Amino acid sequence: MAERKYFGTDGVRGLVGQAPITPDFVMKLGWAAGQVLAKQGTKKVIIGKDTRISGYMLESALEAGLAAAGLQAKFTGPMPTPAVAYLTQTFRAEAGIVISASHNPYYDNGIKFFSSEGTKLPDDVEMAIEAELDKPMTCVESALLGKASRLNDAAGRYIEFCKSTFPKELSLAGLKIVIDCANGATYHIAPNVFKELGAEIITIGCEPNGTNINHEVGATDVRALQAKVVEEKADFGVAFDGDGDRIIMVDEFGEKVDGDQIAYIIARDALRRGELKGGVVGTLMTNMGMEVALRNLGIPFVRSDVGDRYVMEKLLENNWLIGAENSGHVILLDKVTTGDAIVAALQVIASIVGSKMSLKELCDGMTMFPQILVNVRFAGENDPLESDAVKAAQADVEAKLGDNGRVLLRKSGTEPLIRVMVEGEDAELVTQYAQQIADAVKESC
């Protein structure tokens, strides 16, 4: 396959105002996507965004490009990424588009696409869009130009859908839950879902102002949530990222519960109910503790490349239903078509309520291996992963770990970073080994 120019592991992403996240490029991207995706005849495209201030500018640019291709833009306003996937299906739209850079800071933004089935686009479709981007932009005749309108009931539809995934015989009554919406797209959705199911809720990160998305709140920084759960003596806390496709939880003692543990809880509960189909898909970053815990339950486990799209591919390949990344993407194919943090949270809570166990107790069956991740900024021409010094450092650490640990080096798909991950039984040694490799990477950049 030809090398990509624009699409990364999660759409097109970058710093606002610099290529490719500029109004002129995004307008042409909308047009190019329209040329490739407009095959159903409905001519409708659902467009959602998170709470970044640049979302206003970029949705206008997308609208212009789609209109030039003869498509109708339907705006949801701030809306979680999985909500756009859901609404794309229910409105029988040609495609869904999300304007978001997910967990990144506010000055980044991105564009990602969903097919008419509510799934992320396969590689060949993204390459077809890139091919259209190399062509001169054209415009349909005036009578065929697209129009734009707003979907005023989008939030209500999605709230009802989320609630429908929670068992009707259960209730959240009596639970005190702290919800952290990262000042992002779930700020007006998640509190209503949990409140309407009966919980007492306390919110943080629910006051977006355009520039505070993911800032010291949300799934990538749970310190505020941890403190609030302990302060309020809550049963647990739930943190979402800026676009609502990642979830991290916090138990009653303020301890972090990541995507690996969440998937383990959901899979074990499905096994208990006799409803588990197949096994669980993790990634190269999934903690070895999850693999061991699932094996002890007799649940099959396989790893995919890093990225929720690759988790999805492996799920479909195996005809399984549960997949996750430790960063908090949790995919439950019996309920959704993409990672949905609110729906994943509800399944964990259903296990808490149904088993009458605490979140901490549900996590106790899985012992996490110490895992250290060091990010090294990479902006040079040379590929440090091809350096003899880096290869030697990796080989040395792998020899020392033997069968009791792992080393993973990879380039980030969304940022100019080399990620160095070392995992093993001894936290002190793992930290030392990770720094040894990271130092070699820095010297080779």
UniProtKB/Swiss-Prot annotation:
Belongs to the phosphohexose mutase family. This is Phosphoglucosamine mutase. It catalyses: alpha-D-glucosamine 1-phosphate = D-glucosamine 6-phosphate. The lineage of its organism: Bacteria, Pseudomonadati, Pseudomonadota, Gammaproteobacteria, Vibrionales. Binds 1 Mg(2+) ion per subunit. The active site is at S102. One of its GO terms (molecular function) is phosphoglucosamine mutase activity. Its EC number is 5.4.2.10. The gene is glmM.
